Amino acid sequence: MSLIQRLRAVVAGDDYLDSDFDELDDYSRDEFDAGNRNPREYTSGLASFSGSNPFDVSGGSSSNVIGMPGISTATAEVNLMEPRSFDEMPKAIQALRERKTVILNLTMMEPDQAQRAVDFVAGGTFAIDGHQERVGESIFLFAPSCVSVTNSFQEEPAPSNVTTTTQQSEETISESVTAPEPAWGTPVASAI
């Protein structure tokens, strides 16, 4: 059969091109109907998993809250690190990735290495959407995103030897209105 004849047959809708599918006609309608009556016979193994949720930790209750895999419900951990060199900083990043809070005491390090260490861990903390807080002199707290950090310290009161005044006298106000004298000397009066 030539190509032109086949095209004519397709356009005209001749049935002789459908002869390849005639072997399906050998099945009787009764066999198809019998198969449709029992659909469980043809279901896959995935249907048995449709009723179970592997992430459900509620124990069969009707709660809409599901657990996240990989996150333990154990108590939170805090790692206190006193590194002596920058080479120990990847341990702090790994602890943050494991959702542990890290407190770095950098008093044992040189100041330039300590600055580098803080920058490195702060970058890692930022990458995981964590929080950082300066706790004291060369002591820093880094927490993952699952930990909320709040600062409950209030501003320290002024020492007793420092007095603050809120009212200004008229002399002080009048002095502040005049222009200050230049630091290089008194201005010379210009001749008119």
UniProtKB/Swiss-Prot annotation:
It comes from Prochlorococcus marinus (strain MIT 9211). This is Cell division protein SepF. GO terms for biological process: division septum assembly; FtsZ-dependent cytokinesis. Keywords: Cell cycle, Cell division, Cytoplasm, Septation. It holds the Pfam family SepF. Homodimer. Interacts with FtsZ. InterPro entries: Cell_div_SepF, Cell_div_SepF/SepF-rel, SepF-like_sf. Belongs to the SepF family. Residues 154-192 are annotated as: Disordered. It is found in: Cytoplasm. Cell division protein that is part of the divisome complex and is recruited early to the Z-ring. Probably stimulates Z-ring formation, perhaps through the cross-linking of FtsZ protofilaments. Its function overlaps with FtsA. Its main location: cytoplasm. Residues 162-178 have a biased composition (Low complexity). GO terms for cellular component: cytoplasm.
